[in-house]
């Protein structure tokens, strides 16, 4: 029997430590930061990952994968009150990987290929591999607040898609701020290239499950106390976990 699926042509893993990543705060959070005495970052949440695949000019089998991660940063600001004020903002991190995606000269069209909007563009029919990125929410390693230097601007202006801006209740402040929040994040990710292939697999008879479904109330005919008696006593959970100072997580530096 012939099937159509994807095969992994190449893959890599990364352990990125992104230092001093600027956080673009919302308008309200920026006002709070300007008057805050101290700031502590609570968490970083991955919102979206943009992936672009382009062939390498000098090697037809390899492709350049540009990846941009968008994070929601949540922090607490101490402004002299008993309860800290919540801060929210966006951090952006970009990286690049080069992987082997194999070479294919065929052009692929499918029945769901449609002409796009009135700009005259059509969906691409080139047979490029598909990039897949698996990533965990990053760990916040440290944070700090720095004064924005007057009369200077960042060397690179960040491009924030409208769909990402819409995820925040207020506008994001990208310029004209007095103080800036920076974070250092640790992130684990896996990047791979996949390509469509046709495979021939041996066909066997349809597998019929041998296990019968439970039709009694609660789907359990066994005596609950008898089932509980076979569970081992969780002695490890009653033992306090010791502190290893050599492997402890570093405190946030403001």
Q: What is each stretch, according to the model?
A:
Residues 1-254:
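Viral structural modules
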């Amino acid at each position: 029997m012939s099937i159509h699926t994807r095969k992994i042509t190449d893959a890599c893993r990364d352990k990125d430590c992104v230092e001093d990543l600027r956080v673009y705060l919302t308008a309200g959070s920026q006002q709070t930061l300007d008057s805050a005495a101290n700031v502590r970052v609570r968490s970083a949440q991955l919102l979206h990952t943009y992936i672009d695949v382009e062939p390498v000019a000098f090697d037809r089998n390899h492709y350049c994968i540009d990846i941009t991660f968008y994070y929601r940063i949540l922090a607490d600001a101490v402004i002299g009150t008993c309860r800290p004020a919540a801060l929210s903002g966006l951090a952006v991190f970009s990286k690049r990987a080069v992987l082997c995606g194999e070479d294919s000269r065929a052009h692929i069209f499918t029945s769901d290929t449609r002409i796009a909007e009135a700009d005259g563009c059509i969906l691409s029919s080139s047979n490029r591999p598909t990039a897949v990125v698996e990533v965990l929410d990053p760990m916040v390693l440290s944070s700090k607040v720095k004064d924005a230097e007057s009369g200077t601007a960042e060397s690179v202006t960040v491009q924030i898609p409208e769909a990402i801006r819409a995820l925040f209740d207020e506008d994001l402040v990208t310029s004209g701020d007095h103080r800036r929040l920076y974070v250092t994040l640790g992130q684990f990710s896996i990047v791979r290239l996949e390509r469509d292939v046709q495979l021939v697999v041996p066909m066997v008879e349809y597998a019929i499950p041998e296990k019968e479904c439970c039709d009694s109330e609660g789907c359990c005919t066994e005596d609950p106390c008898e089932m509980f008696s076979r569970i081992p006593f969780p002695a490890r959970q009653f033992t306090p976990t010791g502190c290893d100072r050599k492997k402890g997580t570093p405190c946030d530096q403001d």
